[in-house]
Design a protein with these regions (language model features):
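Active-site beta-strand->loop->alpha-helix modules in alpha/beta enzyme cores, enriched
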Residues: 1-85, 207, 217-230
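The feature marks non-catalytic terminal segments
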Residues: 78-230
Length: 230
């Protein structure tokens, strides 16, 4: 968690939401550049393969969501450049995010299925776990978002796919270094797992070892032939 205060601004216009949120944070000494620097540091520190963030329009116009997504689009580039925010580069090195998804982004759309029971969650779905998590977010329970998440007693929401407005399942691939999605439904499509990377690294080591053996075998055989020819 960051130390940024939970401040609020809202507008249906992205530009206005951005300006209002920027002004609110600047009033407490926090600039847009601070947002970019913080996200850049997080990327370098945690080295994610995939990053997922807010809608560029802040979903319903939430100014801080707008600030966050805008800053991220700059941070994914900054994180690769050691001269950009050099202090965090010196601490953690640089890092290139392989894929960046934004909520409700219109290009390269992807629909996630968060209603599949997951073994790691003891058969619960990702959406059910998110509902349990939001139950602890007491400061937000008075907002319209509570109904968006849970529905009503007469019509409770049991699945993420049942939410149509600001669907939690719809994203778009904003940036990729590993190609575009072909299958869909998986943020990690085209991304090699840690296990696969370890296997590839081991194969590379074996290949190098084999080449070295072959080289010395050929040299030895060549020396033997020279002796015979003499």
């Amino acid at each position: 968690m960051s130390e940024f205060p939970d401040l609020y601004a809202e507008s249906k216009e992205r530009k206005t939401a951005f300006e209002q949120a920027s002004a609110v944070f600047e009033s407490v000494g926090i600039t847009y550049d601070d947002f970019i620097g913080y996200i850049t540091e997080c990327i370098r520190r945690f080295k994610p393969y995939v990053v997922v963030s807010h809608d560029l329009d802040g979903e319903y116009g939430h100014g801080t969501h707008v600030l966050c997504s805008a800053a991220l689009t700059e941070a994914i580039t900054c994180a690769t450049d050691a001269e950009c925010y050099p202090e965090s580069a010196n601490l953690y090195g640089t890092w290139e995010v392989q894929k960046t998804y934004l909520h409700l982004y219109g290009k390269n759309p992807i629909v996630m299925d968060f209603d599949v029971p997951l073994e790691h969650f003891e058969g619960k779905t990702a959406f059910e776990v998110s509902q349990e998590g939001f139950a602890c977010h007491k400061s937000q329970h008075w907002t319209w978002f509570y109904k968006w998440m849970y529905g009503t007693e007469e019509s409770p929401i049991k699945k993420a796919s049942a939410i149509r407005k600001y669907s939690p399942c719809q994203y778009g691939l904003y940036d990729t270094k590993v190609g575009f999605d072909r299958i869909g439904g998986d943020f990690f499509e085209n991304v090699k797992s840690y296990t696969q990377q370890e296997r590839d690294a081991e194969r590379e080591k074996e290949f190098v070892r084999d080449q070295v053996k072959l080289y010395f075998t050929m040299r030895r055989n060549y020396s033997d032939w020279k002796l015979i020819l003499r």
